[in-house]
């Protein structure tokens, strides 16, 4: 789609939004405190005075609380979030200084789909969400746990994140679009993460979720609201993608239609029937007089049905007889001679030959053919005047029998008899129809067979799972022994009456057709269960269920450059530049890209007065000639610290700095747990109270105050009975495409854009599908002619993958 069309659409959105304004639709918001029905008697909270009197405020302080939504509220929340790319969480909070806690969490079991957390110890606000089935965290440095009132508004618009604090825009970031289709069973928690973790300590007021663009306007009406949001733009892009998908489908249909037309041009569409040299068009009907059938031409095939004859009620002086050229008997007058009754056409030999015609015996002067047998062997056939020799072919003279009957010679006459499997129509054996032996139960099919009717006969077919013994009997088929089954190699095949059944072997799970190995404790960090309770671990992990990270640094598997130090990460490691060094932008895995920082050239040194800065590898030195100017004092925050002076940083009460010979050195405060006045905030390891211990996320392990541990790509620390967790620091990557592999916590560089997790939603990076239709970056479609192949436009390249389960099911 041309860029000018997109700009026109963009202008239309801007204009429409400016004109319509921002009226609040009550169906597009959720008042959390009202929906949770909090009252002063709710366990764990106390109603208190808030920042204003327009709404209720509640103090959250007791850890023995479970403030979560009722099932009907959870269902309402799921419906509100469904397919929404734009929402804002608002609240007015007053958090106890230096504490950590979750203000709001929307989660299902262990998955946080929306969670806002404030950490006092690290002075940051964290937004936890899910993208592509994986947890994501955005850490936003800000000190909100200060005992003061704050208005907080976190807005998400597709891949755009906005954080307003006290109506000031604090952060604006591009993030991976969060998953908003909440699974059944999702729950909303206020003031805590779940039953045991993330307890917020402080007051919460005005908790709301707004499902409309620029929802922060509800809290701060004077903020700018005229610009379209990221979601607006992505909606336009999605509209273009939908049009492209429609164009692709129409192109496919057009190509198919053109192919069909090309085929039709080379053939005659109408299917005709040719019978006895005559051509009949489709749906033409005619009478097959020879066989007394009504026939129709249907799509090139002849379908015939036996003509039905009406019942005859002949008078006493007439008899039903066949007339040549007619299919049904008719009533004709009978003749009587010497007590013998003759029907129309029958003859009798008296002195002369006479034939019954119209009820009168008429003299026949027809000459008889000469015979080649002796007179004593002559035979007079019934109702005839001419004698014949033995073995005479009466069938050659008799009326023609139908297709399902056959002529049979007797000594004195010929008759039509129905073939085996047929029965006469209305008592006339010249015309016969099929006997359905199956329906009439006239078959001899035994058990484990199915009777199948055929023209003139029937067949006994074996039911599935059985093999034929003779024409009427079947015996059970050994599917398992013969290998004619679809059981998985790790399944047990059992013969059954219907055929066979498949059951997974002990230690495997599945439907028998597909059996997967089962590991009771699971395989963590992307490990694969290859046999019962046997995991194959990905690189960087070990243990019976891949629960142990391999410390490549401690094990000596890695040798970092001397300008860097090895930092272990779950499943991986990286070489981090030492203090006084920085990366040159090539980000070498071994740390070779760490180069010295020239503090002197950058004027980041602390040399004072007449002293000269001398750059050193990983640091600097101050050289001062002897004299009164060489005091060794240090400049600090616009002031001066004397040589030998020690002080505590105002922004970090847990760090102490000293000035020595013009250089400033800072370190963490040493902890003396024997000192009764020790600062437990800076020295949590000195807090021996039982109430200050922390339960880990699994609820299985207890940590002491001050302990550190790693969980799900987060670094956690126990402080005053509450675990504070933050994302592990990952090395910077200077490559275009990155991917996070299963079980790892940090992305790696990849050269193939199809392997990359990150997608550049750039309308200039398009792809051409198999029909030549242009697709925007991020578009997904099914490959033509291959329903199990899905393609995606990633960074200007078509990336296709095959769904193996789809192939198995189709």
From Swiss-Prot:
Q: Which residues bind Ca(2+)?
A: 434-435, 437, 453-454, 457
Signal peptide as annotated in the record:
1-21
One short Pfam name that applies is: EGF_3
All residue ranges annotated as the EGF-like domain in the record = 434-475, 476-516, 517-547, 549-587, 596-631
Q: Which PANTHER family match?
A: NEL HOMOLOG, PROTEIN KINASE C-BINDING PROTEIN NELL1
Describe the function of this protein.
Answer: Plays a role in the control of cell growth and differentiation. Promotes osteoblast cell differentiation and terminal mineralization.
Please report the name of this protein according to its UniProt entry: Protein kinase C-binding protein NELL1
Q: Whose protein is this, by species? A: Rattus norvegicus
């Amino acid at each position: 789609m041309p860029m000018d069309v997109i700009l026109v659409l963009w202008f239309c959105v801007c204009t429409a939004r400016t004109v319509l304004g921002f009226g609040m639709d009550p169906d597009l918001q959720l008042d959390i405190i009202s929906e949770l029905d909090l009252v002063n008697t709710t366990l764990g909270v106390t109603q208190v005075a808030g920042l204003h009197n327009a709404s209720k405020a509640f103090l959250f302080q007791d850890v023995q609380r479970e403030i979560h939504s009722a099932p009907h509220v959870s269902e309402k929340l799921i419906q509100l979030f469904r397919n929404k790319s734009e929402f804002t969480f608002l609240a007015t909070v007053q958090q106890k200084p230096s504490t950590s806690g979750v203000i709001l969490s929307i989660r299902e079991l262990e998955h946080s789909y929306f969670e806002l957390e404030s950490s006092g110890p690290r002075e940051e606000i964290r937004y936890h969400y899910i993208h592509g089935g994986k947890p994501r965290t955005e850490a936003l440095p800000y000190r909100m746990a200060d005992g003061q009132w704050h208005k907080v508004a976190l807005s998400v618009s597709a891949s755009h994140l906005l954080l307003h604090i006290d109506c000031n825009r604090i952060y604006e970031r591009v993030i991976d679009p969060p998953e908003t289709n909440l699974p059944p069973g999702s729950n909303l928690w206020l003031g805590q993460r779940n039953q045991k973790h993330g307890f917020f300590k402080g007051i919460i007021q005005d908790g709301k979720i707004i499902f409309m663009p620029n929802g922060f306007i509800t809290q701060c009406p004077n903020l700018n609201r005229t610009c379209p949001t990221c979601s607006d733009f992505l909606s336009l892009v999605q509209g273009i993608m939908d049009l492209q998908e429609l164009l692709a489908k129409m192109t496919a249909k057009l190509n198919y239609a053109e192919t069909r037309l090309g085929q039709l041009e080379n053939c005659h569409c109408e299917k005709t029937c040719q019978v006895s040299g005559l051509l009949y068009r489709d749906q033409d009907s005619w009478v097959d007089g020879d066989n007394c059938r009504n026939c129709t031409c249907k799509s090139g095939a002849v379908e015939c049905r036996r003509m039905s004859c009406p019942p005859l009620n002949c008078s006493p002086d007439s008899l039903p007889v066949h007339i040549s050229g007619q299919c049904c008997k008719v009533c004709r007058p009978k003749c009587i001679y010497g007590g013998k009754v003759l029907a129309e056409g029958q003859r009798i030999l008296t002195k002369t030959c006479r034939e019954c015609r119209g009820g009168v015996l008429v003299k026949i002067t027809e000459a008889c053919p000469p015979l080649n047998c002796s007179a004593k062997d002559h035979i007079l056939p019934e109702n005839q005047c001419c004698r014949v020799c033995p073995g005479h072919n009466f069938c050659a003279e008799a009326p023609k029998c139908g297709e399902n009957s056959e002529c049979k010679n007797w000594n004195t006459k010929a008759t039509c008899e129905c073939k085996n499997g047929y029965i006469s129509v209305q008592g006339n054996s010249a015309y016969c129809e099929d006997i359905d032996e199956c329906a009439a139960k006239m078959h001899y099919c035994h058990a484990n067979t199915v009777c199948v009717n055929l023209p003139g006969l029937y067949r006994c077919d074996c039911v599935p799972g059985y093999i034929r013994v003779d024409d009427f009997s079947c015996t059970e088929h050994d599917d398992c022994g013969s290998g004619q089954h679809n059981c998985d190699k790790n399944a047990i095949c059992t013969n059954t009456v219907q055929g066979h059944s498949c059951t997974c072997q002990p230690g495997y799970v599945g439907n028998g057709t597909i059996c997967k190995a089962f590991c009771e404790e699971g395989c963590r960090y992307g490990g694969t269960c290859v046999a019962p309770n046997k995991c194959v671990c990905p690189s960087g992990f070990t243990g019976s269920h891949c629960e142990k990270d391999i410390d490549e640094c401690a094990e000596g598997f890695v040798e970092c450059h001397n300008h860097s130090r090895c930092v272990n990460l779950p499943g991986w490691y990286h070489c981090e530049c030492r203090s006084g060094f920085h990366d040159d932008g090539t980000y070498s895995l071994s740390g070779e890209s760490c180069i010295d920082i020239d503090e002197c050239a950058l004027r980041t040194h602390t040399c004072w007065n007449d002293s000269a800065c001398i750059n050193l590898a990983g640091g600097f030195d101050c050289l001062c000639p002897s004299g009164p100017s060489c005091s060794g004092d240090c400049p600090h925050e616009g002031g001066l610290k004397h040589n030998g002076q020690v002080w505590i940083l105002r922004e970090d009460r847990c760090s102490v700095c000293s000035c020595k010979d013009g250089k400033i050195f800072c370190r963490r405060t040493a902890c003396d747990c024997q000192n009764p006045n020790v600062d437990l905030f800076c020295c949590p390891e000195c807090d021996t109270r039982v109430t200050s211990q922390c339960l880990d996320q699994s609820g299985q392990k207890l940590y002491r105050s001050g302990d550190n541990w790693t969980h799900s790509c987060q670094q956690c620390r126990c402080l005053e009975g509450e675990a504070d967790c933050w994302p592990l620091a990952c090395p910077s990557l200077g490559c275009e495409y990155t991917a996070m592999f299963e079980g790892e916590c940090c992305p790696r560089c990849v050269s193939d854009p199809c392997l990359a997790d990150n997608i550049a939603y750039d309308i200039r990076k398009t792809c051409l599908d198999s029909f030549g239709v242009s697709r925007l970056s991020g578009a997904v479609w099914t490959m033509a002619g291959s329903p199990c192949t899905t393609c995606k436009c990633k960074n200007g390249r078509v990336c296709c993958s095959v769904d193996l389960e789809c192939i198995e099911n189709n």
